[in-house]
Amino acid sequence: KHGIQSTIHTGGPSIPGSGLIDKDVVLEADADIIGHINGGHTSLPEAHVCELCEKSSRAIEIVHNGNEKIAIAAAQAALQLKCPHRIILGTDGPAGSGVQPLGMLRMVSLLSSLGNIPAELVFCFATGNTARIRNLNCGLIEVGRAADFVFMDRAQHTAGRTLLESVQLGDIPGVGMVMIDGIVRCGRSRNTP
């Protein structure tokens, strides 16, 4: 009604004095986004996470600072339910787990390699899906959208012959340049493989 988007915490307590937000609370709240469905820090049981994917029609946020096994299970459940358009990725940082500068790329690599999900689809979770669901002006290449780009390639000496193949094998891409609002903000770091 007022253009405000709601996200619900999912899983164990995040700060002292808070409590568990279980599947029943998440379903009853019916927030726009099931926040860190794989926990932040502590995840719900896998069966409950899969039930949330099935019984809710809302966005499913999978995060770096959560349970990796449950991250894969949530993504696979959404794919089996034929709703990959609901999956968005995040880091859940900064948080008690700290800040992970490559958290999004690590999530893409994790879900692709260990979850056996095509890398190009996981990149879509991180970019286009997230942009659409969170109403962002980035994440998609279209006239009128922000000119924000990350130029990357396969890491040197990876077993993968292409960027996508190297990600599917579990390697993190080498970032060559970041452009925000059409302006180059940074180039390759000294440590980029």
Walk through the language-model features, giving the residues of each.
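Extracytoplasmic/secreted proteins and extracellular or luminal domains
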Residues: 27-30, 104, 143, 171
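Residues embedded in well-ordered beta-strands within globular domains across many folds
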Residues: 35-38, 123, 151, 179
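C-terminal cap of metal-dependent C-N hydrolases
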Residues: 147-193
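Electropositive phosphate-/nucleotide-binding environments in soluble metabolic enzymes
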Residues: 43, 47, 68, 72, ...
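His/Asp/Glu-enriched, well-ordered alpha-helical/loop segment
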Residues: 76-155
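Active-site core of metal-dependent hydrolases
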Residues: 1-98
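Short gly/ser/thr-rich secondary-structure transition/capping motifs
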Residues: 15-17, 131-134, 159
